[in-house]
Amino acid sequence: MTISAQRRPGSPNFQSGETIMKVSRYLIGAGLAALIVAIDGAEALAQQLDTVTVTAQRREQAVTDVPIAITVLEGQTLNELSIATLDDLQLTVPNFQVTQTGIGTQMFIRGVGTGNDPAFEQSVAQFIDGVSYGRAQLIRAPFFDLERVEVLRGPQSVLFGKNTVAGALSLITAAPTRETTGYVTATWMPEFGDRQVDAAVSGPLSEQLMGRLAVRYYETDGFVSNPNKGRDEPSREQFAIRGSLLFEPNDRFDATLKLEHNRFDSRGREIEVVRDVNTQTLPNGVPLTFANALTGAGLPGAITNSEFNFTRDADSDEFADNTLFNATLTANYDLGFGTLTSVTGYLDYSRDELADLDFTNYFILTGLLSEDYDQFTQEVRVVSRQDQRLRWIAGGFYQSSTLTNNDITGFGPDITNLGFAPLANVGLERRYKTDSTAFALFGELTYDLTDRLRLIGGLRWTTEDKDATRQIAATTNPLGFDAPLVTDPVVLATIQAGLGVELNNPGGGSGHDLSQSRSESRLTPSVTVEFDATDDVMIFASYKEGFKGGGFDVRGNRTAFFEFADETVRTYEAGLRSDLMAGRAQFNATAYFSQYSNLQISQFDGTIGFNVGNAGKTEISGFDIDGRIALTNELSLAAGVSYLDFEYTDFRRGNCAFQETPDGDIVDGVQLCDYTGRRGRFTPEWTGFARLSYDRPVTDTIDFSSVLNVAYTGSHNIHDNLDPLGNVDGYTMVDLRAGFGTERWEVALLARNLLDEKVLTFAANVPFASSVGANTQYAVPLRPRVVGVQASLRF
């Protein structure tokens, strides 16, 4: 695997769209031909596929009746593939990427996602049991004991809300049952010390009351070596517990209460310096890399490794401690003409984190973070009966939330060697708080124009108010809050002139004590036409609008970048859903074209801050194809492929990559770079997967089962500022699970990343390296190959 922008000698140019199209057409054609041959010989032996039921449109439907580009993974599939996080999930969902960054987590669908700023709400909204989880940090939470996962591509604003401009991720947890059931599953992967236990028990507590209790414990030793600390990183520990009660006094009313607590902690991070490019040579002939510059400045061994080899330099005692509590109450009442549903949700999380931000073996720069978030939501909706010509949904939604984010950029004593002696042992403390209140009314009508032709129209009105404050001040403690303010004018001048930070210290000049409010209201419509071409094939076309609210920047250092605008999208889709071969196969396809305005962007400024803004215009287009087929009673295949074309059509405020000539707009005295005509990061042209499942009896009581999953991601850029050196080659991830078992027990072997691909998912520049003329970059790798064993007991 290479992260160079240059081709390897003799290799095809897989960054050429024309070549990719030719290769892909050949592969798709060959695959279809092989599939047809297999179908022809196995059709008589194959059984029907199970019906997959989803709630993507706030009502139960077969997945083939939903006019949305959707990928569904049921609980059994999640268990078979050992999917426990969103990092795992992306390997089975085309056009879906998840990555850790230096200071957060990002999620993208069709190349659209959310940047690093904690103030951003997610363009790919995450829902658990119908409750929005709108903060980036919540992506890191483990998910467990699930009934299914639904990944919806494209805006879903009418029924899911304002922050679904790219799509929605809906997780549905397993519900209490009337029969007593349970399981215990233990997984061990010795390569990196992975140990995981999942358990659940469910059953009746009385005639009208059922309960379920599920737990997850996980720990790992890490997969990136840190010689300075003498350990592997990141070591992780997770514990989660969920209790559910289902009350059904009669056949017209039910209520489900779910309480969940999560704790997920880590020590160290999976970040390493992967390149230290010299652009000059010193008079003595030594290449001017950042490592050599640090050595010359009296910091020998600051960077001992600058290649991608799962080895990192860091001296800080890094940690990340996260706790999450959520409560959800869902009640349904049969009104006769429809069903009244109330979903009440409360969640609270806290995060404390210390990160090494200089990526060296010295104390130059650290980041200390303390974040708290609480949210209350209430949705009430009525869904009409579905056995009538005119069907409808109507409802209202309310949300209130508070985000508090305090952080310190700490300058250690070793920054003196870089020529910033006044900053030694100084902390740059930033305090941020935002309060948000949102209210929405929504409705959707479905009318049967004929027995085969349907018209669906939806509309959502949303209003939101936000109030935010931010202060930045220099203090006398680089690793602690509430320290005395710096009064030395030399220190203040160094921070403002050398780092471009506007301060609130006495004599600091700018008075960086911001307080602003914003209010916005939006109508987001959708129109869909469905036509049943046959009893088994449905064709549809749709137009949808969506928006994500604006807000106020957390991590910026200058007052001019405090507020950012809302993000909007218009999307056109057309596709088909089909059941084929008497229920033994399904084929789905969706083509799309989207126009985004004001995509919210956060980019590293090269020193210690991030600039937040909006990309003027962006266009994306492509298609998503997926299907399933039961080849025989024992063998089944699921596969999908997605193509994405992404272009900034008007974006003149991008951060410049290393030594890139500024040619964009001038903002607050700084000229930026013109990204117009470029692809965004995390936008591979081609992604796809194929999953082969094979199950057969070995004896009268013992069965053999296996799952092989192959996922492909095409070449794309992963750099925060679109540096060409951040281009990564396409890669293929192969996972395998095979085991023996009965209805009561199972033992299986697991292999993740079987081909041992070396993959980087995010890259950015090391702070201060550009000041000496070095293009030094750090990156986040995926784990290399792991093999393990899993044992389960069921009752």
Please give the residue ranges for each predicted region:
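Gram-negative outer-membrane beta-barrel transporters
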Residues: 393, 451, 455, 588, ...
